[in-house]
Amino acid sequence: MRKINLIVVHCSATRSDRRFSVEDLIACHNARFGFTGYHYYITRDGQMYQTRHENLPGAHARHYNQHSIGVCYEGGLTPDGDYADTRTREQKAALHALLKSLKVDYPDALILGHRDLPGVHKDCPCFDAKTEYSQL
């Protein structure tokens, strides 16, 4: 079993007025990596999908994949393409429940956003995940 010390939250960087289904995510990642890079994906309606087994490294945070779990929510861009926290109430609830469950399995893992990793110059996940989930 892999030693997990990070749970990294991402957004799909897709516009909030356009659907990006789990099938779209899988097709996009398969074309790029040959597999899905995130371990979990949460769509706007709050549905959570496991898209990669936890004991396999992902492809979501360069230099950190070996010891992390990647969780992505659908969205992160306004209809105009600006970065924003576009999580729905359902996504927030599903994300909180998933992260709480992952902390049971990986109690020493730090939850943070992709943007919080050293050397990452992105807005992803477009909110302060480190602060929001610091009490889990």
Briefly describe each language-model feature range.
Residues 1-56:
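Short, conserved "active-site rim" segments that organize catalytic pockets and cofactor/ligand binding
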Residues 55-62, 100:
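Short amphipathic alpha-helices and their capping/turn segments at secondary-structure boundaries
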Residues 20, 59-66:
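A short, polar/proline- and glycine-enriched secondary-structure boundary/capping micro-motif
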Residues 1-8, 12, 16, 44-47, ...:
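Basic/polar, cationic surfaces and motifs that engage anionic cell-wall
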